[in-house]
A protein has these predicted regions:
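Hydrophobic/small/kink-forming positions within alpha-helical transmembrane segments
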Residues: 59-63, 93, 150-154, 158, ...
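Structural signal for membrane-spanning alpha-helices in multi-pass inner-membrane proteins
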Residues: 95, 187, 222-223, 247-251, ...
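Short, Lys/Arg-rich, polar N-terminal cytosolic tail immediately upstream
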Residues: 1-8
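Extracellular/periplasmic helix-loop-helix junction of adjacent transmembrane segments
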Residues: 35-64, 103
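Hydrophobic transmembrane-helix bundles of small-molecule transporters
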Residues: 143, 165-276, 283
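12-transmembrane solute porter fold
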Residues: 10-27, 32-36, 47, 53-56, ...
Length: 454
C-alpha cells in the first residue's frame, strides 16, 4: 500500500489547538447551566436574573465571531487565536475574584470575546490544509470537532455540578486557566504563520465599524427589552428597530460590510443553513439552561445531581455523532435529530415536581440524538455551501446565528421562568420549541437537494 507523505496528509499537529480552541465556548456555556442557581444564592438575587451571565457571553460572541472571522480571513489565524485564548484565562481570573454580580457579567462578556477565535480558526485551517494537500475531504476533522463540541456541551453540566459540589461556583471558571494555557502553547507551536499582504493601517478599510456599532446597539437594546419587557422601556425596542433598518441600508452600500447581505441574498442554501443554525440553537440552549434550571428549582435536585441527570444526553449524543458522521446525508441527520427534539418537547408538557427520575433521564437521553446530529449536519452544510474565500467569515456568521439563538433562548427563559411557576414555564418553553422544530423540518425539506451530501 502506498504511504501518504506529510505533504499529502492533513497536519495532525493542528488537531489539539483546533479542538481546544473550539471547545472553549461550549465548556463555558454548559458548565454555567448548573451554576446559575448557586450564583443567584451567593449574590442574593432572583435566579432568573442570572440569565444575564448567559446573554452577556452570547452578546459578545454574536458580535465577535464575524469580526474575528473576517480578521482571520485577512491576517491568518495564529495571532488572533493566541490573543483570544489568553483573554479567556485573564477574564476567568476576574470572574473568580470579582466581588459583584455585574463584575461577573463583565468577565463573562470578556470570556465570550476570547472564545470567538477557536471555530473560525479551525475552519480556516481546514481550508488551508485542503489547498496545501490538494485534497478537499474534511469530513473526518469536521466530525472530530463536532464530537468534541457535543461531548463538552453535554458532559459540561455533569462536570460543572461536581466541581460546584466540591469547590463552589468559582471552580467552573478555574477550569479555563489550564485550557487557556494549553491552547496558547499548542497554537504557538503548531499554527502556521500565514503571510498576508494586508497591513494594520488598512484595517479601517477592511472592518465595517459603523455596521458593527449598529448591529451591537440592535442586539443590546432588544436583549434588554425582551428580558425585562415593560412599557416604560419600549423605547429600547424602537431604537433597536431603527438601528436594524439603518444597518441593512449601510451593509448593502458598504464595500466591506460587517455582514455581507448581498452575498447572503444570492446564496439561498447558505441562508437556510444560518436560519436552521439559529433555530437549532434556540432548542439546544433551552434544554441546556431551561431544563437544568427546572431540575434544580422545579424538581429540587442539587447542582451535582442535575448535572449527572444530563449524562445520558452526552452518551447518546457522542454515539449518534460517531455512528452517522460520515454515513448519513445531511438532510437525514436534520430530519432524525429534529424529530427526536420534538419528542423531547412533547415530553416536557407532562413533567412535574413529582415526575419519576427515570422519565427525566429518558428525556435527556432522547435529546442526545438532536444534540449529536443537528449541529454536525449544519456544520457540514456550511462547509459545502460557503464560498471558500470567505470560509472564516462564513463560519463566524454561522456561530453568530447560533449565539443569537442562545440569546433568544435565554430571553425566553428569563420571561417564562419568573415567579413561582417554573413548571408552567418549562411547559411553555417546550411548546415554543415544538413550533421551532416544525419550522426546521420545513426548512430542511425546502433545501433537501443541497443537503444530499454527507
Amino acid at each position: 500500500m502506498r504511504q501518504v507523505s506529510s505533504e499529502e496528509a492533513f497536519n495532525t499537529k493542528l488537531y489539539p489547538p483546533m479542538i481546544l480552541g473550539s471547545i472553549l465556548n461550549p465548556i463555558n456555556s454548559s458548565m454555567l447551566a448548573v451554576a446559575l442557581i448557586p450564583i443567584a444564592q451567593a449574590f442574593g438575587i432572583p435566579f432568573y436574573q442570572t440569565i444575564w451571565l448567559v446573554s452577556s457571553l452570547y452578546l459578545a460572541t454574536s458580535i465577535g465571531q464575524p469580526v474575528i472571522g473576517k480578521l482571520i480571513d485577512i491576517f491568518g489565524p495564529r495571532g488572533l487565536f493566541l490573543f483570544a485564548t489568553s483573554l479567556v484565562g485573564v477574564a476567568s481570573l476576574i470572574a473568580i475574584f470579582t466581588p459583584s454580580f455585574y463584575g461577573l457579567v463583565l468577565a463573562r462578556f470578556l470570556i465570550g470575546i476570547g472564545t470567538c477565535a477557536g471555530y473560525p480558526s479551525a475552519m480556516y485551517l481546514i481550508s488551508y490544509e485542503g489547498k496545501r494537500t490538494g485534497k478537499d475531504s474534511p469530513s473526518k476533522i469536521l466530525t472530530m470537532l463536532s464530537i468534541s463540541n457535543q461531548m463538552i456541551s453535554v458532559i459540561g453540566p455533569t462536570i460543572g455540578g461536581l466541581l460546584i459540589h466540591s469547590g463552589g461556583w468559582q471552580s467552573i471558571f478555574l477550569v479555563n486557566i489550564p485550557l487557556s494555557i494549553l491552547s496558547f502553547v499548542f497554537g504557538f507551536l503548531y499554527y502556521p504563520k500565514v503571510e498576508s499582504p494586508k497591513k494594520l493601517n488598512a484595517l479601517k478599510e477592511q472592518i465595517d465599524f459603523i455596521g458593527i456599532t449598529l448591529f451591537t446597539i440592535t442586539l443590546t437594546t432588544w436583549m434588554i427589552f425582551f428580558m425585562e419587557p415593560d412599557q416604560s422601556i419600549f423605547y429600547l425596542f424602537i431604537i433597536g428597530l431603527f438601528c436594524l433598518l439603518v444597518f441593512v441600508i449601510v451593509e448593502l452600500k458598504s464595500k466591506k460590510p460587517f455582514i455581507d447581505l448581498r452575498v447572503l441574498g444570492h446564496n439561498g442554501a447558505l441562508n437556510n443553513t444560518y436560519i436552521r443554525s439559529l433555530l437549532t440553537a434556540v432548542i439546544s440552549y433551552s434544554v441546556l439552561y431551561g431544563y437544568v434550571q427546572w431540575l434544580e428549582e422545579g424538581r429540587g435536585l442539587t447542582a451535582a445531581h442535575a448535572g449527572l441527570m444530563m449524562l445520558p444526553q452526552f452518551l447518546v449524543g457522542i454515539f449518534m455523532a460517531q455512528l452517522t458522521g460520515t454515513r448519513l446525508s445531511i438532510k437525514f441527520k436534520l430530519y432524525l435529530g429534529t424529530i427526536c427534539a420534538l419528542i423531547t418537547m412533547i415530553g416536557f408538557q407532562f413533567i412535574h415536581a413529582d415526575t419519576p427520575l427515570w422519565i427525566l433521564v429518558l428525556l435527556a437521553a432522547i435529546f442526545g440524538v438532536p444534540q449529536g446530529l443537528l449541529n454536525l449536519a449544519n456544520q457540514n452544510a456550511l462547509y459545502h455551501q460557503a464560498p471558500k474565500s470567505m470560509i472564516g467569515m462564513s463560519a463566524g456568521l454561522s456561530r453568530t446565528a447560533m449565539y443569537i439563538g442562545a440569546i433568544v433562548s435565554s430571553t425566553l427563559i428569563s420571561t417564562l421562568f419568573k415567579g413561582d411557576h417554573i413548571t408552567n414555564g418549562i411547559h411553555e418553553l417546550g411548546l415554543f420549541c415544538m413550533l421551532i422544530g416544525i419550522v426546521i423540518i420545513i426548512l430542511t425539506f425546502v433545501s433537501r437537494r443541497s443537503l444530499s451530501t454527507r
